[in-house]
């Protein structure tokens, strides 16, 4: 796969996850500010994630899932293999 194709695929993944985070956050009745506080993130990060402009690492994804009261596979079923993982610590 060429670099351009990989970049497009990554962008699509970021956008898909971002849209899902936004839908689930709203369904939970949370503002971006509330989600960011609960997940330990800056509100601007939550905004960028929801717009598909921020690449998530597993720790951030796990923090968002926990703040929403769910597992990462609910955010994106393609991530089901990550669902059993707990937040990673160095």
Language model: regions and residue ranges:
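Short basic helix-loop element that most often maps to the first helix and adjoining turn
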Residues: 19-38, 63, 89-90
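Short, charged recognition helix plus adjacent turn
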Residues: 2-6, 76-90
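Recognition helix of helix-turn-helix/homeodomain-like DNA-binding domains
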Residues: 40-55
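A short, Lys/Arg-rich alpha-helix, primarily the initiator
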Residues: 2-27
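DNA major-groove recognition helix of helix-turn-helix/homeodomain DNA-binding modules
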Residues: 59-74
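Conserved hydrophobic/aromatic packing and binding residues within compact polymer-binding modules
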Residues: 21, 35-36, 46-49, 75
């Amino acid at each position: 796969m060429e670099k351009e194709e990989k970049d497009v695929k990554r962008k699509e993944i970021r956008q898909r996850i971002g849209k899902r985070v936004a839908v689930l956050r709203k369904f939970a009745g949370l503002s971006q500010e509330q989600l960011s506080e609960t997940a330990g993130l800056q509100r601007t990060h939550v905004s960028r994630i929801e717009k598909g402009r921020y690449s998530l690492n597993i720790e951030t994804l796990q923090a968002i899932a926990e703040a929403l009261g769910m597992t990462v596979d609910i955010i994106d079923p393609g991530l089901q293999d990550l669902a059993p993982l707990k937040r990673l610590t160095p």
